[in-house]
């Protein structure tokens, strides 16, 4: 029931000049083998009508082969149990893949952390957040060209992709520029 009512918000970000980089077959293969969508979350902002910081988070998780959907709400009063509601249900891998593919249509930013390479995806950050973990260990410091290869591959799936690192920022998707004018 909660699932059927979910709607993907319209991505809200400016179109910038695109850079194009064709990924090598070897790199794309390695990337695909190590790319998993581990968590998808809708984050709904406060309820302005009631003036309460009411939030609803619908979160998809995939861990150890088990896919779950969790719906959690809060009306902003952290002192009462009645103000919070949480329910988790197990969903099939097919349902999980269908939802994550449908939702994966927004700005993508790239970060590196101690656990691997983490892609955090934002469309309208006030509405929702999608996080994609790329479990990939490189035997060398990842280069700018390799980072472009990664994000360019994702852009071929039909998403507007941004790559952000500590040292530089790229927007590497170009195929939908004309359609969006």
Positions of PLM-derived features:
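Phosphate-end processing signature that detects enzymes handling 5′-triphosphorylated RNA
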Residues: 1-181
